[in-house]
């Protein structure tokens, strides 16, 4: 009986030790950090999957996996991870934004617009509203785009965000967000055949940034009755 008790105790101790070992994520974290230092995203992702498996469905490391996929431009996997995270906590704005950008990069423009629409409600961020207006404009939903761009104008601007425009094959221009919003508003008004309003919006964009090449070209196009340049 004593021998049996010792054997059973040893077995229970082994099981307890094994459970601690399998649930210990410190080694996985070390491997992940080392992999990231060496630029090996595949190993880093594998380590994160091990951590998530040990922590369970609510693992906070799913956020890290989403960021890893996003930074690696693996937008399909990023979208899937973000969807899983948001099914448990729909208030994570950075995760919502990554989901929206992933959809846009995958060419699912209307679905991306739906996600941005949810994000704008939560963030009250004028850049998010601008992105929403741009996506609606891309799929020719001009009324929805106009409402979104007017919302973008109403929201607070930090003055920190720039939008990049391709002026030509060799030159990109950084433009203040408020100027970009006014230019987009002019484009929408042009498509709605509101030429005087379009001129006013393009002029406003130039007032906000005097060297805004595309806005200048669009204003001149409206004056001359020509086609404007799209975003």
Which stretches of residues belong to each language-model region?
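N-terminal leader/linker segments that initiate helical-solenoid repeat arrays
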Residues: 18-64, 80
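Residue-level recognition of tetratricopeptide repeat
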Residues: 33, 67, 101, 134-135, ...
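Canonical tetratricopeptide repeat
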Residues: 64, 98-101, 131, 165, ...
